[in-house]
Every structure is written in C-alpha cells, then in structure tokens.
Amino acid sequence: MSSSSPNPFRRSLKFVEQWYRETPQRALDGAYEAARAIEEIEKKHFKGQPVPLRIRTESVMTNYFQSEVQKNLQFIQTRLREFKSSSLVVEVADKLKPPSIPPAPTPLDTPNTIDFTDEYDVTSEEYSSELVSPSIDAQGSLDKLAFIDAVLKRYRSASIQREAAAAASKAARASAPKSGSEMKKNIPQPLPIQSAQNSLYESEFISDDITEDPSKLDSSSFIPRSILRTATRFRKELNPDPGTEDDILNDFRNSRVRTRAAVSFVLGLMIVPLLTQQVSKNLVIGPFVDKLKGPEQIEIRINPEIENEVLTELARFEERLKFESLTSPIPLSPAEIQFQLKAKAEDLKEEYQWDLRQPLKNAISDLFSLVALAIYFVLNRQKIAVLKSFFDEIIYGLSDSAKAFIIILFTDVFVGFHSPHGWEVIVESVLSHFGLPQDRNFINMFIATFPVMLDTVFKYWIFRYLNQISPSAVATYRNMNE
C-alpha cells in the first residue's frame, strides 16, 4: 500500500498545476467580458459614446451606469494584473522545468504488490499536451487584449471624458426646465476626487488635473500673475456663452472638492502614523517585549545614563538612611540598613524596568508607523498632486508681505539666532526616544552643521526659484529682513 500513497498526492499537484496554467486565459476572459459589458452600456444607453464619469447628475440611471462602468473598470484592471503575473510565473516555470525522466520499470513478478502507477502517472509530454487547450490561440488572445485596450483608452483619456461631460452637460441644459431651482438641480456636477460614495478607482482612468498646464505654477512670466488672473476673470465674466456659468460652478465645485481632499489627506498624514504607532506599541509590541528576558540589561549597557540614574537614586536613598540613623535616638543597625537598601533596589528595578524597555518598543512601533505611512502614500498617490496644487494656490494667492513674513518666520525659527536651543531640545528628545546616550559632542556637532546646511538650502531656494516666481516678494523679504 505504500507505493500507492504518492499517486493521489501527485494527481492533486497536477490538478493544481493545470488549474494555475489556465489562470492567464481565465483572467483574460474575465477582463474581456467586463469590457464587453461596458461596450453594451455605451451602445444601449449612451449612443455608442463613453459614459461620462466626470459629472454627477440627479439622474438615478446615469449614476447607476457610472457605478457599473467604474466597477467593471476596476475588475478589468484586477484581472489584467492577474493575467500578467500568472503568465510570467507560467513562463518562468516552463523555462526552469527539468527534462522529463521516464519512470523506472516496475517488476511485475513481485508477489502481493498492486501496481497503481499506470492509473495516474502520465509523462511530461502527455501532461503538457493536456494543459494546452486547443480552444486557446494566440490570435484570439491578442484580439481580446486589443479590444480591452480600446475600451480602457476611452476612460484613460481626459480629453475624451471632457467631451463626454460637455455633451452630457449640453443635453442636460437642453432638457432642463426653465425654473431656476430645477435648472440648478439638473446641472451636472463634477465627481469628487476619490469620494467615499463613488469608486476610488476612477482616478486611475481620468486625468483630473488641477490646471490644463501643470507647469504653469512653476514657470516665470514677464507679466505678473495677478494681472493675468484678473484678465482671465474679466474674460470669463464678459463671455456671452451661456455655458460659462456652468463652467464657473464646476470650477467652484472642483475647488471645493480639492480643498476637502487636501485637508483630509493632511489629517491622514498626522493621524495614520500616530495611531499606528500607539496601537502597535500598546497592543502588539508592548506585550511581546515585556515577555522578553533581559532587554533592560542590554539597554543599561548601551545607555550608561540610565544606569547612572539608578545608581544615583540608590546612593541618595542610602545617604538618607544614614542621616536618619545618626539623627534618630534609636540608630538603625547595619543589618536593617542593608535590608532597606535591598528592598529599595528591588523597587528601583521594578520602577525602571518599564523605562528601560521603552526604547525598543519605540523603535519597532516607529517602524510600523513608517510602513503605514508608506502604504498611505501609495494608496493616495493622486491626492499628493492635489495637495501640491492646493498649497500652490494658497502660496501664490498670498500677498508679497505675507510671503515675506512666512519666510522670515520659518528662517528665524529653524536657522535664526535662538534656533540652537530649540535644536538641542529636539536632538535630546530624539536620542531619549530611542534610548541612545546623549553625547554632548554629537549634539554640538549636529547643531553646528545642520542649521547651516538648512540655511543654505533656504537661501538657494530664494535665489533660484522665488526670485523668478515672485521678485516683489524677494524685495519685500530683503527690506523686512534689514
């Protein structure tokens, strides 16, 4: 019976291998069916045009089709990733597969032996031929990929989506009632960036740029930006096109959505690392580190200040006992003094055990918070661009005096005359957080070099960028600094 035991296991392995080899075609078929579903929605309900994902109306049908298209787009991307990864694994496995070795002949004259090998065993050539389905052809796969790419292209292109949104907006205005409240109700509204009630996947297909020219904020111009913005505002206000009001409303809604997205992203930057650090430290890392034996001894050797603190307090307690023994009418015996010193030493050990293990907990929990912050950045990549544009709008919207005031405030705080005291507190806090010794030479060297380098970076930024973007702000900064 021992010879038959490997055969079911081998058959299970072959079944799993065959199933995984069919994964690329299965994933491609799933993506193809989702793309066909999107095309059916376009043909039946949008006259063959792409579904406008950049607008939101009060129409329940339109919102339903938008959510269906977004769901299918997300499903297509998931299946395409599965198709690429599984195809790569199958290709690498085929290249690394060793040549087949024919099995050794089984003696037929052995008594009381049942031969199960012919029932399940197949050669590698027969197995490979079984895995390759005759219905799967390369040309069919290429046709499906081309069809999927054509569908995705209609939703990756921002220009196509703008045309679809404009067409939907015109259709809504043409069919809207004449009353002002109902017209305002039927005006298509822009979808919020990664809003909670809509699919987060929309941002991967639509280039929802803040401006038509991303480099406009970073380039210098002979004409001041305030004059250009005022001229653009007058041009929009004097434009007789009835669609201008819709554009202004859409711009306002987009600006409001960007502000909310930027504020939520900044709050997430503060809350996610802090919450991860505290939760992991108190619920995961803390109980694990408390069970370890001897980390406090390692910490004492690394940080002699902790050892000195313990010994100083114990010596102070011993001196207090001797003083009380000398001033008391009934002096303490040496045995009683030794007993109280031993009890105090045990209390100090229990008291400082928590502090001695804190640096290890802090280091591991900080690593967890960094990982959580990296994941947060990866999941909110589009909001980084939104945050940059939000800060650009705020900074460029300030007056020259306000810009100069902010620059002077930051430079005086970080690289000013009194900044070494603040840097000393920061460095000592960081060293204490990780349980490192507070070496005065290292602290003085850091304070003598890092603020100088930071001051150089500030001056280079003012000379290289701010002088081109806002020369008047630089002039105001120099006058205020003098």
From Swiss-Prot:
Cellular localisation: Cell inner membrane
One of the Pfam families matching this protein, by short name: CemA
Cellular component GO terms held in the UniProt record: plasma membrane
Keywords: Cell inner membrane, Cell membrane, Hydrogen ion transport, Ion transport, Membrane, Transmembrane, Transmembrane helix, Transport
InterPro entries associated with the record: CemA
Coiled coil: none
Keyword Transmembrane annotated: yes
Keyword DNA-binding in annotation: no
GO molecular function, one term: proton transmembrane transporter activity
UniProt topology in membrane: Multi-pass membrane protein
Regions that span the bilayer: 265-285, 359-379, 406-426, 442-462
Role description: Required for H(+) efflux immediately after light irradiation to form a rapid H(+) concentration gradient across the thylakoid membranes. Together with PxcL, contributes to transient H(+) uptake following dark to light transition.
Protein family per UniProt: Belongs to the CemA family.
Entry protein name: Proton extrusion protein PxcA
Species whose genome carries this gene: Acaryochloris marina (strain MBIC 11017)
Gene that this polypeptide is encoded by: pxcA
